[in-house]
Swiss-Prot record:
Pathway(s) the chain acts in: Cofactor biosynthesis; biotin biosynthesis; biotin from 7,8-diaminononanoate: step 1/2
Cofactor(s) for this UniProt protein: Mg(2+)
Signal peptide location: none
HAMAP family assigned: BioD
UniProt source species: Methanococcus aeolicus (strain ATCC BAA-1280 / DSM 17508 / OCM 812 / Nankai-3)
Primary location group: cytoplasm
NCBIfam families given in the database record: bioD
Name of the protein: ATP-dependent dethiobiotin synthetase BioD
Function as written in the Swiss-Prot or TrEMBL entry: Catalyzes a mechanistically unusual reaction, the ATP-dependent insertion of CO2 between the N7 and N8 nitrogen atoms of 7,8-diaminopelargonic acid (DAPA, also called 7,8-diammoniononanoate) to form a ureido ring.
Enzyme active site: 36
């Protein structure tokens, strides 16, 4: 299993999860499942992966905590008077982990987004589920700081960081010296860049690193 997290919201976690899931299921014939423990702002991410991987579970199994408002989970849960139940998340996790040979778990927002007001963060959910992590990052200016902070935060929680996948939301040609940016993340973060995604059909990802 792998936990797909990111340096921020909107960085492309769902997009990258879809690419990884489709490759593992349809090109490597690995029985691959998906779990989105918490989704704020609708059910679109979960529905996208359910369709892409042709999963037969109901959406409430794939996404046990669904919040209507596109806000931090702790805020959305408070506004909607809907306490986040870790037991329900664990039930879905156990069911899916036992059914599938490989489970993709996708986070919401970044690693330090609060799930509860008691300082239970998204990174604590990763620890709770016992999963290693992959960080989805972007190539643009500012990404070095965001990526290195994310790596440090995860490692301080004892989470194994398997690598970073760069999701090119913008064309790489428009990013100045992106090779040096990637090299800086690699060297300063002591982490492998295991993938670069240009679009849904053009990507270079070390899938062995993900499943190994």
């Amino acid at each position: 299993m792998i936990f797909i997290t990111g340096t921020d919201t909107g960085v492309g976690k769902t997009f990258v999860s879809k690419i990884i899931g489709k490759h593992l299921k349809y090109k490597e014939n690995i029985n691959t499942g998906y779990l989105k423990p918490i989704e704020s702002g609708g059910i679109e991410d979960t529905a996208t992966l359910k369709e892409a991987l042709n999963l037969d579970e109901n959406l409430n199994i794939l996404n046990p905590v669904n919040l209507k408002n596109p806000l931090s989970p702790n805020i959305a849960a408070e506004i909607e008077n809907k306490p986040i139940d870790l037991v329900e998340i664990k039930k879905s996790f156990d069911l899916l982990k036992n059914k599938y040979d490989f489970l993709i778990i996708e986070g919401a927002g970044g690693v330090a987004v609060p799930i509860k007001y008691n300082s239970f963060l998204m990174s604590d959910l990763i620890v709770y589920l016992g999963a290693p992590a992959i960080i989805v990052s972007r190539p643009d200016l500012g990404t070095i700081n965001h990526t290195l902070l994310t790596i440090e935060h995860l490692r301080n929680k004892g989470i194994l960081v398997k690598g970073v996948i760069i999701n090119c939301i913008n064309e790489l040609d428009t990013v100045l010296h992106y090779e040096k940016t990637f090299e800086t993340i690699n060297r300063c973060g002591n982490v492998e860049i295991i993938g670069i995604v240009k679009n849904e059909n053009e990507y270079n990802i070390n899938f062995d690193k993900i499943i190994g």
